Amino acid sequence: MSPLFDGKIPGTEILATIKNENVGLLLQIPWDFDKKKPCIVAVPASDSDGLYNAKDIQIRGLWGLKHNCAVVYNDKGLGNGIYDITNDEGFTIDGKVAKDNLLFKPYIKNKTNYIKQNPHRYAIKQLHSKQNPESKWATYILNSFDFALYELNEMFPTMGKLDFTYNNTLTLIYGANDGATAALKAAESIGESKIKGVVAVNPQIQLDQENTSLIMETKFSVKRFQLKSAIDYSTFAALYIPCAIPAIDPSKHDNYVPYASKYLFSQNRCDELKNANLLSNGTPKEALEKLHNYGWSPETDFQLPYFYYYESIYYPYKYISAYGKFDVTENMCDFSVASTQQDPYYNSGEVKPLKEIKFPEIWGLYNEHLPIWANEDATAIDLVENKDMTSPRREWYSSSQIVDQIDYGTKGAICLRKEINNQRVKEGLKQIQSSANLHKIKTFIVHGKNNVKQLAEHTSRPYVALNSVIEGKESQLRYIEVENASYLDGKVPFDNTLLAIDYYGEDAMEWLWANLTNNTTLPESQVIRTKPRGGNIGRAPQVTTENLVPISQKPDSNDLIKANNGGIFIPY
């Protein structure tokens, strides 16, 4: 690439769908694709995003294109699958509003009656497809590789033979968050014959919670992992975070807790939790202590208000609805997806038709994650509490027990917590659990130590420990844990406290590339001792190598992470 690289790479782009599940695929073949040393980078979409999300295109996809590789994205069966029930319309793969050939169009029994009782409602593919797409993520990645190889052979044909096959093409997977989960699942399912390397950043990987043999050791303690699923700890968070906010100590950098001032009704949530016998004293301090005991460390407290404000109840809801294969008409836990009041003035989150934002605009605003924001202070579409004491509205504004006493929808949060024990949900969860057998594929897992969304203690750390049992000394897994990094990217309001985890994803990809193309020795598993930028929010100093310390090929012995026979040692 030229030193004057402007982000524009010429080439060919091809869109396709896997028809039965309407999984979106996007293939990019750069003009300087190396036909003599062919490579394909598969990028399963981050979280619940669609094909054209900025981070995958600008970070993971760009990495592949800059290395002269073809890049193939897949939306994991999620994508921009939003369907307007009232107007019978949704989106095609290229973003057009239509009534047919949609990314998602559910069958709704007694549709007219449902619309009458539930106006301005929407169906979401991840929530309402009834397919539990996560159980098929590995297959979708294999499909994306097959698609890429087929198109490469079509574009660069040689009479009588296929020039590009799994045998002669370097095949890599680079994913983040749920895309990282998909990457690991693909390695487990497909094996070394078709996948040569994986980088997984902040995977929401889930093991069998009944496995009680795995050990975590630090400099000061040895304990067994108490494994919890994502739906377990995220429903726990959804219960207690709104109550805990007033007990959070301000950041030592600027005496401030981002977004804490938005929580005006925390004590109401605490009171309702006490009434439900979920708190003894009904104080924010008690709620925060519960979160600490469940896996959130005190050093991550300052992220919790922001995390809940933008993730809210929807984060656990999407997994539970998918695992349980709930129909849109079931309105699980009396929640549904609706358009809401978009005007920020005197906003109370009521169900309203789309007005300021039109449905065609949703394609550009929506990443398959709710809420869809109309502006900084109001949503266009969100999960709503149907049984609010006054009328259906966003759970952020919901009074579930006493009229006009906002408690952030406590009743719905309690119901959702109970749903994790629903047999149909447990069966769906079982379908997506991981084996940790990577079949000797060279793999990096990169995880932010301060990640409040994908808790390392319930995801990557036990996964590495289990892999040490399954593969033993033949394992090619490297684990990189980064201090002062989360699922966030180090921008305002966390520019002074958190660093961009994606820097380390790219660094891991460079090490993997060097090993697979030049036999460079891979680094050992390690903790990266970073340093926050400091200063005030919005005015943090420029990042330096003191802040973003690169992965070391030969880390200091005090930074080594070791895994052996079901145990993992983290040097803290």
Regions inferred by a protein language model and the residue ranges of each:
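C-terminal His-loop and adjacent cap/lid subdomain of alpha/beta-hydrolase
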Residues: 1-572
